[in-house]
Amino acid sequence: MDKYVCKVATVDEMNNKWDYEINHATKNKENWIIWKKENIERFQNGFIIPYYGILNKKIICECTAALNSLVVQNAEGLVDKRTAYLTGFRTISEYQGKGYFSKLFKFMIEDLKNRGYEKVTIGVEPNESKNKEIYFKYGFNEHIKDSKEFYPNGTEIDVEYYGKKL
């Protein structure tokens, strides 16, 4: 029988997940290496909460809640004492469309509510229509602003930001 668990990640689980991402990156591997170091440090400093969906001891989906403006680009209006910024929505392709991420998302929202958060925000690239459709389904209907973000290697992307009250 399949056993699926939603949880806040441990540092060991984060190391395993990031090593997997680095080893499977087909391009911009340097970004993944930087993100691993940054995210583990941010978790240890209480700036983020990483959430994992684990099926039969395998991490199959994830999302991270950023809790501090120091770790969010264009942070104004996106993160504060009562607003968490959600990032890194990922599900391994063979598990997509099977409800696993939906369960993780519900777990994360309940956990953030229990921690006193009243709103969550996200960023999405304008051309990511599939992701935007999913986010709208999850209730991210409040357009906050548009801006640009930068990857560690200098890549610049356009981003639309949306919010959802909890």
Regions found by a protein language model. Give the residues of each.
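Conserved GNAT acetyl-CoA-binding A-motif
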Residues: 112-124
